[in-house]
Structures are given as C-alpha cells and as structure tokens.
C-alpha cells in the first residue's frame, strides 16, 4: 500500500528526473550531497547516502548509526543545512510539490501485524526509509535463518530496508498465523479427541447379540468387557453378525455352531486343550475314550475275601453249633428211657450224661465213603453189644437200653455226616494244615446207663475212636 502511494506521488515528476533518480525503494531521492557524521567513530569520511545499483548496499554493513540517520532525516524534512533539501519541491510541479511534504516529509508510523502496538515496536517509515528491529523474534531474511537483533555481522546491529521489513513481517505473520492455526487445530483436535473419548467412555456397553442391545452398565465386569448379556452368554444359539453362533466360555467370544460338540458351551478346540491339561496322559498314548476301564479297586477284592472268610466262619459256627447240639441228643436218650418206663428211677438217680466231643476231622475220603469212619465203628460196637446181651440172656430192660444206645449212636453218626458237608469249604483251604492234627481228633462218649449196665454186668461201654 505504501509503495503504491509513493509511486503515485512520483508519477508527477518528469520522466528524465525519475529515470535518473529512482532507486530500488520505489521513490525518488535527493541528489547525494556529501556530509559528515554518519560514522559513529567520527572518522569524517564522505559517503553518498543513496547510490544507484549495488552502491546502496553499503548502508547495511553496520556502519550507519540510527541516531545520525534520525538527525539527517529531520534535517532533510525541514530543508535546513543540506544543499538540495528542497530538490523535490523545485523539480515537482506545484500540485505535486504541495502533495510531496505530506507524503514524504511526514514520517508514517505503523506497527507490525501480529505484535502489540508499543512504543518500542513502532517504526518510522518515510524520509530516510530505515527500519530498526530491536526486540521480538525476527527472521534474518539474508541469512535465511532465525535471529534477533544480531545479524550476519556479529556484534553489530543490522538494519533492514522497508521491503525487507515487509517481507519479514509477512513471514512473521504467516508463521504466527500458521502456529496459531496449528495450535488451534491441535487444541481443537485434542479437544475433539477428548470429547470423543469422553463420549465413548460415557456410552454404556451393550450386548452385541442382534435384537438385544441390553444395557450392561450394571452387569458384571465380564459381561461388560465382552459385551454380552448373561442370557446370551448361556444361550445355545444366538444370532450375532448375521450367523447362528454360540458364546464360547473358553475364548470369550462367539463361534459358529459347527465348532461346538452337541450342547457344549466351549468350542471343540479349546475344550480338547483344556481336558489334555487337566487329565494325566496314559501310558499307551491313547485318548481317554479309548482307554481301558480301570482295574477293580483293592477295597472290593478285600471285601470279597473278607466275605468268603465270613462265610467260612459262618459254616464253622454252624458246624460248632451242630456239634454242640449233639450234646442235646443225650436228652433224647433220656426221653426213650422215659418211654420204657422201667428205668425212670434209674435215670433220676444216675448222674447226668456227659459227652466230650473233640474237633471233627476234615472230609478226606470220597463221597462213597461217607458211611465209613465213626459210623462203621459205632455199628460194629452196637453189633457186638447186641450179641453180648443175647448171650448173657438179660431181660427186656437191657434190650430197651441197648436200643436207646443204638439210637443215640446213629444220631451222632448222622450229625457227623452233616458236619462233613458243612465244613467242606474250610477243608479245601486248610487241608494241609489239618493233616498233622488228624491223629489228635478223639471222640469219647459215655453214658450213665452204660456205666450202670457195666456195674451190673462188669462191662465197660466206653469207646474211643481215632481218625487216621
């Protein structure tokens, strides 16, 4: 804007003067008069203020002091002390001369965009056309990098032309706007992400089964995490993602029904691995389904053995009971004596009958020989007793006593046969152990009636049987 205004003011100058005096800044400058005082060291060298071409670049080597430039600017504005100070007014027409002091002599004050308008940041544009940047971040256009008030010439101040200042201001404005835009964009992005995350966080989890969409805010953590309600987590078939699926407890996700075995709630793959970890591997490497059944427990075998022993004990107890009941057979003899009637007083006066019965031997003979042993001996004794009674010629009382004794012996023989049958199991197991005891089995039986008859007839009816 400023350059266009300066160009508009310079159009009123004649073409020859403009062609001779126009420099790179776009406005006409007075003739270069020699003057002293630009060097801060007071060297007094004569320098041309404005030169055409590359001579003007000597102004930016750091030898120009801003205080001297300001004094020169005021002198040029007032037209005092400098020859040719009113050169523009003399060369320009009256209209242009009237407009020139307002546009060139009055320094224009402006602030850089994007910076606070303070006294330190206000820079005069106009007569001298020099700008000094003391504070704030400044980009070094010549060097292409960033810098402050120190330029390429280290230790000296750097001054820029108005065009350079405008370029720097544009870069500053662009960078600041870009930074602000980036910061705003990042801020909005972060804010947007925060809002989105907050919205996502506050959105309640819902069941992923189609048609359910149950709110799982008050459900268990497991159901909230896997987004499935309690009902669909245990359902046999669930419509999810357009397919009939089932929720796997091992995988914690939905699988198609083909991956499950029947009504299992864990997929086949994970269930196989789970069972393999829990069960011990077999010796043959067979699976649990093909493995043979486990052997019967020792407890059952012991129980069966104990039961067999118990049964044998029962048989032994029964045998002993039968043997003990043999004692009651003597009572039967007493009953027969009562029937006879002749020996009631004798039986009352006689001492009670006694019977000593030792342990019976096991059955070692064959089945055909069941009538041998004690039965044969008893029969032989009864036969000899009958012959003896007949030879002596005793009365009917002796015959009745002999018959009762014969009945007693037969009952004892019958009980012996029953004992053999009942003690069969014990004889098979303990046959070898009882061989050495066979010689000690003695059956002795005595009767009070026999003792009475022996006292009368001087005969002993006491017999002993050894089983060999």
UniProtKB/Swiss-Prot annotation:
Q: Does the keyword Membrane apply?
A: no
The residues the record assigns to binding Zn(2+) 1 are: 207, 212, 229, 232
> Which GO MF terms does the UniProt record name?
DNA binding; zinc ion binding
**Keywords from the UniProt entry:** DNA-binding, Metal-binding, Nucleus, Transcription, Transcription regulation, Zinc, Zinc-finger
- Function summary: Trans-acting factor that binds specifically to the consensus nucleotide sequence 5'-TNCGTACAA-3'.
Xref: PANTHER family: SQUAMOSA PROMOTER-BINDING-LIKE PROTEIN 4 (PTHR31251), SQUAMOSA PROMOTER-BINDING-LIKE PROTEIN 8 (PTHR31251:SF169)
Protein's UniProt name: Squamosa promoter-binding-like protein 5
Encoding gene (name): SPL5
